[in-house]
Amino acid sequence: MPELPEVETTRRGIEPALVGKRLCGVVVRQPQLRWPIPVKTLEKELVGQVIQQVARRAKYLLWRCPQGTLLVHLGMSGSLRIVPEHTPPAKHDHVDWVMEGGQMVRLHDPRRFGAVVWIPVTSPEEEHPLLAKLGPEPLHRSLNGRYLHQGSRGRQLAVKNYIMDQSVVVGVGNIYASEALFRAGIAPAQAAGKVGLGRYRALACAIKAVLGDSIEQGGTTLRDFIGSDGKPGYFVQSLNVYGRAGKACPKCGTTIEKQVLGQRSSYYCPQCQRA
């Protein structure tokens, strides 16, 4: 599943093809994604608009224009590619946005868990049900050790599950949670309410560093993710623990272990990450 670094990589990739350009048409070959695509609404409200900004909130891409905002979510296996106009579609190429200047932005989504939603200008974007309850952005200064510490008091769930809660902080998916906890030296199964302020400060720094490093390397390609230029992400080469059960810890040489928390695989070093 594309996580925050992959979505931010996509945003940066498609931005030059969209911002300041007029959208000349939309071609929907398969409207049945996570929710039905509002084809007639897009043809009426979006076509002819100039895209003013391509933003990101959590894992949602927001194409802002005078009449509203197009919200795009990549789902489990989606990607956006920039292709020349009239490029024949491949299997699972469900939507084309045709831009002035001879380029298209194409949505490829094999599993069809992605979403294309129109938010009219008359509806406050931040109040949309998909956006209203999201926590702070992990790279923003509002995400810090004190914030994580205060929100965790009295909570018994595993600290890994705590930082993956999108109402606590957005965009810390399974891969990046494992990697950030490793960098901070915190056991993933430790109760969130028992982690001290100093360790949460280290964890907040680790979250920012892991996500920042991944964005700089174009995200993490394990299976489905391909950037807007057709290239994979390379952060997979920098993973310390995720997917490395049975291998040596890069810090101390102890065998990396795997456990399931909240129905997700977690990877950690039992020596470096003690409760």
Curated annotation (Swiss-Prot):
Catalytic site residues?
Answer: P2, E3, K59, R264
Provide the reaction this enzyme catalyses.
Answer: Hydrolysis of DNA containing ring-opened 7-methylguanine residues, releasing 2,6-diamino-4-hydroxy-5-(N-methyl)formamidopyrimidine; 2'-deoxyribonucleotide-(2'-deoxyribose 5'-phosphate)-2'-deoxyribonucleotide-DNA = a 3'-end 2'-deoxyribonucleotide-(2,3-dehydro-2,3-deoxyribose 5'-phosphate)-DNA + a 5'-end 5'-phospho-2'-deoxyribonucleoside-DNA + H(+)
Q: Where are the zinc fingers (FPG-type)?
A: 240-274
The protein's UniProt keywords, in alphabetical order, are: DNA damage, DNA repair, DNA-binding, Glycosidase, Hydrolase, Lyase, Metal-binding, Multifunctional enzyme, Zinc, Zinc-finger
- Spell out the molecular function terms from Gene Ontology: 8-oxo-7,8-dihydroguanine DNA N-glycosylase activity; class I DNA-(apurinic or apyrimidinic site) endonuclease activity; damaged DNA binding; zinc ion binding
What is the role of the protein in this entry? Answer: Involved in base excision repair of DNA damaged by oxidation or by mutagenic agents. Acts as a DNA glycosylase that recognizes and removes damaged bases. Has a preference for oxidized purines, such as 7,8-dihydro-8-oxoguanine (8-oxoG). Has AP (apurinic/apyrimidinic) lyase activity and introduces nicks in the DNA strand. Cleaves the DNA backbone by beta-delta elimination to generate a single-strand break at the site of the removed base with both 3'- and 5'-phosphates.
PANTHER family, per the entry? FORMAMIDOPYRIMIDINE-DNA GLYCOSYLASE (PTHR22993:SF9)
What is the official name of this protein in its record?
A: Formamidopyrimidine-DNA glycosylase
Provide the species name: Magnetococcus marinus (strain ATCC BAA-1437 / JCM 17883 / MC-1)
